[in-house]
C-alpha cells in the first residue's frame, strides 16, 4: 500500500494505530505485517506506553525509533463537571452513593466483578448503588449475577444512551469504576481506556482495571486507582474508600479534570498530529 501511495505522489506516510495492533504484534503472520508497515511508512503512532511497547516488539529497531505517541483527545467542553441532580432524582438516586460504569457489556470490561464486589461494598456503604451504562452480549449474565446476590435494588441497567447525554450520566455518579481485565493470554486488552479520561474530565475519581493500557489513563493515587480486575477485595476496598471520603473524591476529581485539560485535550493531540504529518 505504501509503495502505491508513494508512486501516486504521497511524500509522507503515517500509520495510525488504535490498540488492537497489540495482538497483531504478538501473533504470526500479523506480526510480520506490522513489521512491514513499520518499514514502509515514515512513522507509526501509538496510544500510550503499553501499546507503544507492545507494537515496538514487532518492528525493527529503526522503525520503532520513528514511533510517535498520538492519543485520541478529549473534548473538555463536552466532558466537564455538570449538575446532575435532576437526573439522579429521575433515576431514584437522590440519597445514594453512586458508582457509575460506562462500557460495552462484555467479559473483559469487568462489570461482572463490579457486581460481585457489591455485597462487600454494601456491607460498609449500605446506600451504595451501581449504575451500568451500555449494552452488549453479557447483559443476561450480568442480570443473573444481580439475581444471585439479591441486589436488584442496588444495581441499575441503563442501556445505551446518546453521546450527547454521556457527560450528564457520568456526572450523576460519585465515582467512576470499570475494572477491566486482560483475556486470551494478554491478546485481548484495553488499548488505553478513553472512558476513564472522559470520567476524569467530568471531575470524577476513577477505579480502573490493570489491563493493558488502562493504567496509562490514570495517575495512581492522584486521579484514581488501578486494581486487579478479578480481585473483589481490591475493587471493593478502593470503591468504599472513595465513597466514604467526600474530600478525597473531590481532590482526585479535581486533579483528574486538571490533568485532562492540561495533557489530553483534543486540540493538543490534533496539533501534534498535524506536526507529525508535516514532518
What are the residue ranges of the model-derived segments?
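Donor nucleotide-sugar binding/catalytic pocket of nucleotide-sugar-dependent glycosyltransferases
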Residues: 12-15, 35-82, 93, 157
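A short, well-ordered alpha-helix in the C-terminal region of glycosyltransferases
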Residues: 127, 154, 234, 241, ...
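Acidic donor-binding loop of glycosyltransferase active sites
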Residues: 160, 171-189, 204
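Short hydrophobic beta-strand element within catalytic cores of glycosyltransferases
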Residues: 196, 201, 205-208, 218
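Conserved acidic donor-binding segment of nucleotide-sugar-dependent glycosyltransferases
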Residues: 219-221, 225-232, 241-247
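A short, histidine- and acid-enriched strand-loop-helix "catalytic/donor-clamping" loop
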Residues: 11-28, 43
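Conserved donor-binding/catalytic core segment of Leloir-type glycosyltransferases
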Residues: 45, 93-109, 115-118
Amino acid at each position: 500500500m505504501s509503495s502505491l501511495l508513494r508512486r501516486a505522489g504521497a511524500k509522507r506516510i503515517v500509520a495510525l494505530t488504535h490498540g488492537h495492533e497489540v495482538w497483531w504484534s504478538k501473533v504470526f503472520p500479523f506480526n510480520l505485517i506490522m513489521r512491514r508497515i513499520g518499514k514502509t511508512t515514515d512513522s507509526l503512532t501509538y496510544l500510550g506506553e503499553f501499546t507503544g511497547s507492545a507494537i515496538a516488539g514487532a518492528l525493527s529497531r529503526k522503525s520503532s525509533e520513528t514511533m510517535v505517541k498520538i492519543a485520541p483527545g478529549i473534548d473538555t467542553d463536552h466532558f466537564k463537571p455538570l449538575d446532575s441532580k435532576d437526573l439522579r432524582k429521575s433515576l431514584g438516586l437522590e440519597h445514594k452513593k453512586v458508582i457509575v460504569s460506562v462500557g460495552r457489556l462484555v467479559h473483559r470490561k469487568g462489570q461482572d466483578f463490579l457486581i460481585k464486589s457489591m455485597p462487600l461494598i454494601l456491607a460498609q456503604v449500605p446506600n451504595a448503588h451501581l449504575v451500568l451504562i451500555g449494552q452488549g452480549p453479557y447483559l443476561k449474565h450480568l442480570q443473573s449475577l444481580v439475581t444471585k446476590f439479591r441486589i436488584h435494588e442496588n444495581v441499575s441497567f441503563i442501556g445505551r444512551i446518546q453521546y450527547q447525554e454521556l457527560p450528564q450520566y457520568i456526572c450523576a455518579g460519585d465515582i467512576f469504576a470499570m475494572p477491566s481485565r486482560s483475556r486470551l493470554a494478554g491478546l485481548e486488552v484495553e488499548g488505553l481506556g478513553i472512558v476513564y479520561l472522559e470520567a476524569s474530565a467530568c471531575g470524577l475519581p476513577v477505579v480502573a482495571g490493570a489491563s493493558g493500557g488502562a493504567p496509562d489513563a490514570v495517575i495512581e493515587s492522584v486521579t484514581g486507582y488501578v486494581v486487579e480486575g478479578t480481585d473483589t477485595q481490591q475493587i471493593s476496598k478502593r470503591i468504599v474508600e472513595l465513597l466514604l471520603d467526600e474530600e478525597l473524591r473531590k481532590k482526585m476529581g479535581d486533579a483528574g479534570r486538571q490533568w485532562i485539560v492540561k495533557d489530553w485535550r483534543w486540540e493538543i493531540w490534533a496539533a501534534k498530529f498535524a506536526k507529525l504529518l508535516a514532518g
